[in-house]
UniProtKB/Swiss-Prot annotation:
Classification via HAMAP family: Ribosomal_uS13 (MF_01315)
Organism: Geobacter sulfurreducens (strain ATCC 51573 / DSM 12127 / PCA)
Record-stated family: Belongs to the universal ribosomal protein uS13 family.
GO MF assignments: rRNA binding; structural constituent of ribosome; tRNA binding
The protein's name: Small ribosomal subunit protein uS13
Positions of disulphide bridges: none
PROSITE patterns: RIBOSOMAL_S13_1, RIBOSOMAL_S13_2
Function, as annotated: Located at the top of the head of the 30S subunit, it contacts several helices of the 16S rRNA. In the 70S ribosome it contacts the 23S rRNA (bridge B1a) and protein L5 of the 50S subunit (bridge B1b), connecting the 2 subunits; these bridges are implicated in subunit movement. Contacts the tRNAs in the A and P-sites.
Higher taxonomy: Bacteria, Pseudomonadati, Thermodesulfobacteriota, Desulfuromonadia, Geobacterales
Length: 122
C-alpha cells in the first residue's frame, strides 16, 4: 500500500486518480507530478514499485504544499482577513458569501438552513 503525505492511497485505482485523494493535489497537479517523476499515469497503485513511490513522495515533499501545511495556510489566510477587518474578513466572520454573490435569495450553503421570521410576509 502506498502511503504519501500521511494518506493511504487506494490500491485499485490508477495512480493519477489516487494522488487526488491528497488534499491540495488535483488532476492537473497529479499529471504534472507523474510527468516530472517519469511514472506512467496508467499504473495501478498496487503495481507501483517502491522506488516509484519514493520518487513521487520526494517530489511532493520538495515542491508542493499539501495536507496539514496547506490547510493551516488557508485557515491562517482567512484568520488574517478577519483580523484586518476588511470586507472579505467581515463576510467570513458573519458566515456570508465572500465573493459578491447575492444573499436576498440563495446563499443557503453559507447561511445555513432558512429561519422563519415572524410577521414577515412576501
Amino acid at each position: 500500500m502506498a502511503r504519501i503525505a500521511g494518506i493511504d492511497l487506494p490500491r485499485n485505482k490508477r495512480i493519477e486518480i489516487a494522488l487526488t485523494y491528497i488534499f491540495g493535489i488535483g488532476r492537473t497537479t497529479a499529471q504534472r507530478i507523474l510527468a516530472e517523476t517519469g511514472v506512467s499515469a496508467d499504473t495501478r497503485t498496487d503495481n507501483l514499485a517502491e522506488s516509484e513511490v519514493a520518487k513521487i513522495r520526494d517530489y511532493i515533499d520538495k515542491n508542493l504544499k499539501v495536507e496539514g501545511d496547506l490547510r493551516r495556510d488557508v485557515s491562517m489566510d482567512i484568520k488574517r482577513l478577519m483580523d484586518l477587518g476588511c470586507y472579505r474578513g467581515l463576510r467570513h466572520r458573519k458566515g456570508l458569501p465572500v465573493r459578491g454573490q447575492r444573499t436576498k435569495t440563495n446563499a443557503r450553503t453559507r447561511k445555513g438552513p432558512a429561519r422563519t421570521v415572524a410577521g414577515k410576509k412576501k
